Amino acid sequence: MISFYEWITTKYRTKSGDFKDNRFGDLARDVYRDRNFPAASTDKEEISGYLRRCGACGPCMETFEAAWKKYAKEN
């Protein structure tokens, strides 16, 4: 199983290397730029806890939940 970090930063990039212009691309860009993000994690609670501790807003958490559902289906 690949990590959530690897999945989202790969799935939501364009062929040119930019992040897609949607809420999932925005989350992927934020995750990519965060040097402290638990990049090796495949654990939903660990990642959501990290996002909450970092002060993620409601829409960000909603996007994470939706992205996690897609990630879980594909992995």
Question: Where do the PLM segments sit?
Answer:
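Short intrinsically disordered terminal tails
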Residues: 1, 72-75
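Short acidic/histidine-centered micro-motifs embedded in hydrophobic/aromatic stretches
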Residues: 11, 30, 67
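Short, charged early-sequence alpha-helical segments and their helix-coil boundaries
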Residues: 38-69
